[in-house]
């Protein structure tokens, strides 16, 4: 889908598109140690890791972790190096970028959508590269608050943008599947940089565009 200009907004909505972080051959994650640890967990909960249904589970989990945490060994800034030199100096917004990550507190998934808006200062990045940056940061043990800040800070510095806004909406399975068990509850975090932080009118505009449905 090509971006469309709406007023002073260059906007593209990304729906149901997955940007997969592919594990690198240089990824130093030790799959054997993970598999051994999973086997010990199965024993610790009273299961038989040698029964048919669990025999390959340790290796499956090891391969899964190799994929889920591949962002630990990838530099998200690499996706910001190629940009277009453009005179466009109003808001660019990419809304509803789906993501999932693993919370470092309980090692349980949280997932949702990320909205990124920025005002360029001569550097416009390819829209898919924003999703790539998200994929690298989200394929690590994370906290939603830190994930939000990391994305905003990287884009603000690497693009030398006039303003950056990142809003993350996520459902945490550590709250929906355990503990208080409140499915459907969302955590919303935001990080603002530059003009969106300094100027109330700019902040109100970008938040209105993000919330517009």
Kindly give the residue locations of the regions a language model identified.
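A domain-level signal for the structural core that forms small-molecule/cofactor-binding pockets
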Residues: 10-213
